Curated annotation (Swiss-Prot):
Function comment: NDH-1 shuttles electrons from NADH, via FMN and iron-sulfur (Fe-S) centers, to quinones in the respiratory chain. The immediate electron acceptor for the enzyme in this species is believed to be ubiquinone. Couples the redox reaction to proton translocation (for every two electrons transferred, four hydrogen ions are translocated across the cytoplasmic membrane), and thus conserves the redox energy in a proton gradient.
Listed GO MF terms: NADH dehydrogenase (ubiquinone) activity; NADH:ubiquinone reductase (non-electrogenic) activity; quinone binding
Transmembrane segments: 10-30, 40-60, 80-100, 117-137, 166-186, 208-228, 246-266, 276-296, 304-324, 330-350, 374-394, 409-431, 452-472
Primary location class: membrane
Coiled coil (UniProt feature): none
Organism, as annotated: Protochlamydia amoebophila (strain UWE25)
Reaction(s) catalysed (UniProt annotation): a quinone + NADH + 5 H(+)(in) = a quinol + NAD(+) + 4 H(+)(out)
Class of this enzyme: translocase
Name assigned to this protein: NADH-quinone oxidoreductase subunit N
Subunit comment: NDH-1 is composed of 14 different subunits. Subunits NuoA, H, J, K, L, M, N constitute the membrane sector of the complex.
Length: 480
């Protein structure tokens, strides 16, 4: 009997198909009508992503007995991440619209690349095989290589794009070689049988091959997450890319990589090896300590948010080390809060961004007197990232510390608490600058797309800060 794709298969991958079709429509419009592209590409991008969200729910009952299940599996967790990625794509599209309104650049190809990146993210979240995971990561990465150098007149953009491409290409080799070693050891790359296959092998050589393969895959993911010492690309790339690209990398890439960690270490290899956990512990310690100390010295905001993002990656790795159901709930809640607050910060930067040099701390002096709303928005987002009560950021960090303490990882709890105190200093320092005496009375231009992102972030933070119980209940059900 020849396997064929059925209607059920197409419904189950509906979000992927819609994102792919949206990307093709955008590039066709850009190819044949540049004027039409300038007017409609952003709307088509947002519309396609929104339609994909509805398609997720349309495929809820259609993920069984699918021919694609060995490669792509839209289970409950995959649907959660898919919706998450699509919302991130909508936010990035709105910030890009605000950016192009200010800089008057051609942008049809930009939204095509953004859709391609979201396509890669969805593949990661729904991956049922290491090869699918690799394809998703590389689809995302290749799109970002081009997006980072999208502003052709910005020399710094070219430099950051080339650096990211060069280092990312090397890491892709590590990922693929790691997958090859795993296949050589156990004869499969399917995530659902990795652990059982590993436990059946008896030869020391095969165990070494398997362990080496997992180590190389983890190294590749650590690079994508910008964990210390694999972080060196991140500050330069964040500083050199445009504001919407940096926002998408800080949120989309981070969530995508941790979706890959979830698939690998929560589902395929839960509590894989005690010695391997010690290696990841070391990465967490190094990331938390180094990133927070270096962030103290930054004066350019995009570079500052690069180190802030590295620091948060360290916190996000704590639940990965623990690897149980409650840790998964803590991880997903932290990811959501981090994404909302980061988008809010970049919505403010969309108002302040003037050129390729980006926004410096000095540009924030007296922002409250120029725009009380923007200063308040940035303040609440920074307080959330710092984890200061009563914001949702405090709840997210508390949840992570709670599961770490219950699992006996006292060292991670102590280092996490100390670095949280340190990070509070540099976040509060920025807030102090916002409310200082103004050195510039120039009015800021209004941007509807950035205002939508900022207002949505503000409302979401307020709701999750004071009424998080329903959302936490959903995440608890998700992890079970």
């Amino acid at each position: 009997m020849n396997p064929t794709l059925t209607l059920t298969d197409f419904i189950s991958i509906g979000p992927l198909l819609i994102v792919l079709m949206t990307a093709l429509i955008i590039i066709l419009i850009e190819s044949f009508s540049e004027n039409c592209s300038k007017k409609w590409s952003s709307l088509i991008s947002i519309g396609g992503l929104t339609l994909s969200i509805f398609a997720v729910w349309g495929g809820i009952s259609s993920n069984h007995s699918s021919l694609l299940n060995p490669w792509i599996h839209f289970d409950t967790l995959a649907r959660f991440f898919t919706v998450f990625f699509l919302v991130i794509g909508i936010g990035a599209s709105l910030l890009a619209t605000a950016f192009f309104q200010r800089f008057k650049a051609s942008h049809g190809e930009y939204f095509f690349l953004l859709q391609s990146a979201v396509f890669g993210l969805i593949l990661i979240g729904a991956a049922a095989d290491l090869l699918t995971l690799f394809l998703g990561i590389e689809t995302l990465s290749i799109s970002l290589y081009v997006l980072c150098g999208y502003m052709k007149k910005w020399e710094i953009s070219h430099e950051s794009s080339f650096k990211y491409f060069l280092m990312g290409s090397i890491v892709a080799g590590f990922l693929l070689y790691g997958i090859a070693l795993v296949y050589g050891a156990i004869g499969t790359t399917r995530l659902d049988v990795l652990l059982s296959s590993y436990q059946t092998i008896s030869l020391t050589t095969e165990k070494v091959l398997f362990f080496s393969g997992i180590a190389m895959i983890t190294l590749g993911l650590a690079f994508k997450a910008a964990l210390v010492p694999f972080h060196t690309w991140s500050p330069d790339v964040y500083a050199g890319a445009s504001n919407p690209v940096t926002a998408f990398m800080a949120v989309g890439t981070k969530v995508g990589v941790f979706a890959a960690f979830v698939r690998l270490f929560f589902e395929a290899l839960p509590q894989f090896d005690a010695a391997w956990n010690q290696v990841i512990d070391t990465l967490v310690y190094a990331t938390l300590i180094y990133a927070n100390f270096v962030a103290l010295k930054q004066i350019q905001l995009r570079r500052f948010f690069a180190y802030s993002s590295i620091s948060h990656a360290g916190f996000l790795m704590i639940p990965v080390v623990i690897g149980n159901q409650e840790a998964l709930s803590a991880l997903t809640f932290y990811l959501v809060i981090y994404a909302i607050a980061t988008f809010g910060c970049f919505a403010v930067l969309a108002y302040l961004d003037q050129n390729q040099e980006g926004v410096h701390f000095s540009d924030l002096h007296g922002l409250f007197s120029r725009s009380p709303w923007l200063a308040s928005l940035l303040s609440i987002c920074l307080l959330t990232l710092a984890g200061i009560p009563p914001t949702a950021g405090f709840l997210a960090k508390f949840y992570v510390f709670k599961v770490a303490f219950q699992a006996g990882y006292y060292g991670l709890v102590i280092v996490g608490l100390l670095t949280t105190i340190l990070s509070s200093y540099y976040y509060l320092r920025i807030i102090g600058i916002l409310f200082s005496e103004s050195k510039n009375d120039e009015k800021l231009p209004y941007s509807m797309p950035a205002a939508i992102v900022g207002t949505t972030s503000f409302i979401a933070i307020i709701i999750l800060s004071f009424y998080p119980a329903p959302f936490l209940k959903v995440l608890s059900h998700l992890s079970n």
